[in-house]
């Protein structure tokens, strides 16, 4: 079904009709629509690649009024294997946007397992900054949640387990 695609096409065209110089993205998670059989054949997590959520990142990047890609990644929620599915996800999205001749920003990402987070974030940011795969580079990234100390000296509460804390 093309509900999300048609909506993104209509809304991005509307924004461009008001301000043709405004940069537009969809802000979606970046799920693919390869179908269940193809996702299984490629040994990819079916929920993120099968089309289950009605999102088709490849197709969204063909919209000429969408200027850049903004995938997200939450490995614990999506059942990704660290060191495999996560790296493929980041690489594949850069390849998709490169093929569409569009920039890409790793818009949101998180990992709640703090014993694995530093190493995983290091790997992910190596890819995002172009230090991992030849020809794969993002134009920027955002942590889902970055926080610091409050005025009273306590840390901002970690509501969902994804918060990264800055220095004091």
What are these regions (language model features)?
Residues 110, 130-168:
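Aromatic/acidic polysaccharide-binding cleft in carbohydrate-active enzymes
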């Amino acid at each position: 079904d093309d509900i999300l695609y048609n909506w993104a096409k209509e809304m991005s065209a509307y924004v461009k009709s008001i301000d043709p110089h405004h940069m537009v993205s969809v802000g979606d998670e970046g799920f693919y629509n390869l179908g269940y059989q193809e996702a299984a054949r490629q040994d990819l997590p079916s929920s993120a690649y099968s089309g289950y959520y009605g999102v088709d990142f490849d197709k969204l990047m063909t919209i000429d009024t969408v200027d850049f890609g903004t995938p997200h990644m939450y490995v614990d929620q999506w059942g990704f294997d660290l060191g495999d599915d996560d790296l493929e996800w980041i690489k594949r999205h850069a390849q998709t946007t490169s093929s569409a001749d569009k920039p890409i920003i790793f818009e949101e990402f998180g990992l709640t397992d703090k014993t694995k987070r530093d190493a995983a974030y290091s790997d992910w940011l190596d890819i995002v900054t172009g230090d991992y795969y030849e020809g794969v580079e993002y134009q920027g990234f955002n942590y889902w949640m970055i926080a610091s100390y409050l005025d009273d000296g306590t840390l901002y509460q970690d509501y969902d387990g994804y918060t990264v804390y800055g220095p004091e």
